[in-house]
Amino acid sequence: MYRQQSFITLDQFYEWRPLSRLEALLSFIDFTLLEQFFRYDPHKRGPKGYSWKCLLLALIAMQVEQIATVKALVQRLRSDPVFKRCLGFGYLDRTPSESTLNRFVSLLAGTDVLEKTFRRMVCRARKLGLVDGANVAIDSSKLTAYEHAVPKSRIPENNPAFPNWGGKLDTNGNFIKWFGWKMHALVDTYSGMPISYVITPANVADMDIAEPLIQKMMDDYDREIHPKYYMMDAGYDKPELYANIYTKFHGQAIIPINWRNTKLPPEGINMEGQLVCTMNYPYVYGGNDNGTIRLLCPHACGKCDCPMGSAWCSPSNTGYVGKVKIKDDPRFITSPFRGTPAFEKLYNQRTSVERTFGDLKDNYNLDNIRVAKMARVKVFMDLSCIALLASRLSDAVGKDKSKAA
């Protein structure tokens, strides 16, 4: 039996085959800032080493292909020549070692070039109409540390870069506890793409990070993104946060009321956080005039059957009409009103941030942290977000080409 000789080379096969999802995704990575940071020095002597671009593509492919460890990534590069060629390496080139990739991760951990690259890609998505920025959702997600868990008594008090213990309620109401970090993300509800994010130890409260995260978004994009509504869960219910979002960022916080240990609401407010009349019926929203809300009598509007009638509050045939300003108390005076379908419709958009976290963890390896120290964890967080954004850009451009065809 004679072995038939192939009529095409491996390079020809690679050029003729259809473009894979990984290659399409990697083609949308913006290397502009990375090329400036890893500038080639022709006068440098010694071994040339590996291409920084190939090393970076290998780390991004590790997140996309959900490869568990750097060691497994090296084994994949050695055993899969097509995968190796997709990342820019030649078939006969030496494969980078595990130590080489770990040193490259440490190099990236000392810079913010990956986060700046992510922001450039967000700006590109905005130009393509993928990111709206009018409504955003904020939430946090747990990341378990790779370090061994230690008791609280052994955690340094003055080290904000050390992992800590955190706890929260899951979707079923069960309390979960973990040792590690939190990823706080601000997500565009229109596209489900993250716009800004930070990492903190797990013991940091969500409400304390919301305002710095919004300020970071404003600074990163030179205030080109102006969200009108900020959707958050009840854990962010903090009076100062409402006021700062309204006065500093000119937006409206959409957050359910969390009374915590309060037994009775303030006067003129019911337990749902709605403004009520003297008979404890919620006022009807009458419109917003440049921050001034008109309050209409619920009996006159047919929303309730008040035993006192509309004459109890006003002799007018149209009933009582009042005015309040949002700036006086943005927590309770909102536009739209709490309890209205418009308010609920806005708040339902908050689930977009949960879907984004699920996408990052299920499809881009964010739930598989195998490095220690906050700066190195941040590198893999950046890589996952860049991979997610590149995937969305690739899908959007591919759909446009299909429609044009």
Question: Language-model segments: which ranges?
Answer:
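Charged, often Cys/His-bearing segments associated with DNA-binding zinc-finger transcription factors
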Residues: 1-36, 314, 396-405
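Basic, short loop/linker segments at the boundary and entry of helix-turn-helix/winged-helix-like folds
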Residues: 19-61, 65, 102
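Short acidic (Asp/Glu) and glycine-rich catalytic loops that position anionic groups and cofactors
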Residues: 36-38, 191, 332-339, 361-367
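A short glycine/serine-rich beta->alpha loop
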Residues: 41-47, 199, 371-373
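Short, positively charged, Gly/Tyr-enriched micro-motifs
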Residues: 48-116
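Polybasic low-complexity intrinsically disordered regions
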Residues: 98, 102-247, 256-261
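Helix-centered, glycine/charged polyanion-binding patches within enzymatic domains
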Residues: 243-358
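Basic, amphipathic alpha-helical segments enriched in Lys/Arg and hydrophobic/aromatic residues
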Residues: 343-405
